Amino acid sequence: MEQTIKDRILQIRKREMPEGYVKSVVGIVPADWKHYTFGDIYSERKEPGNENLPLLMVSIHSGVSDGKVDEDKLTKRTKQIEDKSQYKKAVTGDLVLNMMRAWQGAIGTVRTTGMVSPAYIVAEPDDKIYPPFMDYFTRIPRMINQIDRQSYGVTDFRKRLYWASFIIIDCILPPIEEQQKIAAILTTQDKVIELKEKRLAEKLRQKKYLMQQLLTGRKRLPSYWGEWNFPKAKEIFQNVTDKNHKGDLMVLSATQDKGIMPRNEVDIDIKYDVSSLANYKKVCQGNFVISLRSFQGGIEYSAYTGLVSPAYTVLSSKKELCDEYYKQYFKSANFINRLNVAVYGIRDGKQISFEDFGQLRIPYPPINEQTAIAQVLSAADREISLLRQDIEQEKQKKKALMQLLLTGIVRVNV
């Protein structure tokens, strides 16, 4: 970042006025940007929808959908409105917002003409604005904060943004040519993210295929051809209930995406009574854990030594094995499906017993083959992890670009 831009950011943070900037109702902005209200640049569209138009939805994450929504995924409330004439037509370039969730960011520009719920506001733009620019501009914190302030309700759950409140919201906009250039830069960044997300999806498909083939013996790695054994799980693992501790080990929780994790690193705030820790089970590094959601996400591996809820079942190995092989196998679709068949009837919140698990026949390849398979799958995991980090960096770059370009802190050459 150029030093002049760094200096400008520092000045604005100190509430000092950089050269070429002025103070406005929304903060410090470029002097040549113009002040409008939404009522100055939008008029309400009240055209009815019809059966031939695709149904569009607004997401707080991605704005307006650009194609037909899968109606099987709609809420019951949405499905109940069978008379599509109650829906509103939304034309390409219109601004659409969900009255009930606009304060959370459910707002965006229409890319494909369609129809939206009667609970949405549809606003038709005039020629002072470039619609793709507004798709980004309306979702920066400065604008969402204003929308939040103009939304009314006894609680957040009941907040609504009505047309009369929408039209008095302030916005400071650059000239149309600058709007177009900014939108082009952000659209290019979106395409970079989209391309990398497609690569990630392909890597995940490849990993899933490898798991289906290698973990079950359907496909063998070169130089491995011996027969596999398929003993019952209880012949490989044993149920361990170790409460011989002082309750001073770190408390762990099961997660479906990261395995067993320290409870203070889990996003969900899980309450527990410190006095009950004496009843918790000790889990050691290398153990596996059957949690209350294992029927849904498989069995979790613990890279930590600590304490877990007494509702969990802790597994330790009875035979020599490669931890990483079974870490991968217990998260495979093949195993989860078989586990569900074995415990048919168990619902969320019910424990899978060791007896149910122990009767399952699971693969037990030779140790050297377990290790080789684990190495292949771990390499795939590393590629996926690096790609996810790359995507997150691109998203952070987009976030920074939006904050700098859409507020005028950084100007573009037109």
Tell me what each language-model feature is.
Residues P18-V22, M99-M100, G114-I121, V154-E177, ...:
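A short glycine-rich beta-alpha junction/loop motif
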Residues M402-V414:
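Acidic, low-complexity, intrinsically disordered peripheral segments
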Residues M17-N50, I176, P222-N244:
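Non-catalytic DNA-recognition/assembly elements of restriction-modification systems
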Residues G27-D32, V122-P131, R149, W163-A183, ...:
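Proline-centric
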Residues P18, R45-I81, T109, V122, ...:
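DNA target-recognition patches
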Residues A31-K34, M134, D170-L204, K208-Y209, ...:
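Amphipathic alpha-helical segments
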Residues S85-K88, T92-M143, F157, N279-F335, ...:
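A short beta-sheet element
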